[in-house]
Amino acid sequence: SALLVGYISLLRQRKFMGYSLTISFQSGTFQVFITASPIVLISVMGVSPQLYGLYVMFIPAGFIIASFVSGRLVTRIPVNMIILAGNIFGIAGALMQVFLATSGLATPLLIVASIFISNFGTGLVFANCYALALSTVPPSFAGAASALGGFFHQGWAFVLSFFVASLIHTSSLPLGIMQTVTTICAVSIFVFAVLWSGRHTRKV
């Protein structure tokens, strides 16, 4: 009963929900790629499994580099601005996917480059959002908050994986569209649930 009350309380906290859902939707770009890339790169573009493994090996580099950069910037720039920059990188990488697919310029290397950009954005968002999400709740709710955030993250990953596997058969366009949708959701939630809410609260 107490646990249920705690979860209900967390669901009512706008900033906690804003940060948690921002993480979930932003990291969806990587989940979309992991689900779709074997179909797009191996089945559609004819990349060998060995070369595919090499391509995928470089994908986490974007996240790793962004985490390092974020650690350097966090004492100089407001954390929310770093998160917003991560959202913008995510959208840029997703739109690059759409452009490559619609222009006929898509190659395995360029597709991997676009997800590198998106993953760089996720690296700027991930740790900062988690830290701020937990900072908005009482210490006694930290465990429940972490579990609820993980539920949103994995739940959205499940939904994306289902739709991506159903849509992608002959083109990388659905990959770009799904990435664009999830990144636009991420930045919209962050702006309205976190940034706008914070300004409104200060005015009140």
Where are these regions (language model features)?
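Multi-pass alpha-helical transporter architecture, strongest
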Residues: V181-V204
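A late C-terminal transmembrane helix in Major Facilitator Superfamily
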Residues: C129-S172, M178-Q179
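Helix-to-loop junctions at the C-terminal end of transmembrane segments
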Residues: A66-N80
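Residue-level signature of mid-helix packing/kink "hotspots" within the transmembrane helices
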Residues: P60-I64, F68, F158
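C-terminal transmembrane helical hairpin of 12-TM major facilitator-type secondary transporters
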Residues: M81-C129
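Extracytoplasmic gate region of multi-pass secondary transporters
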Residues: R14-V56, G62
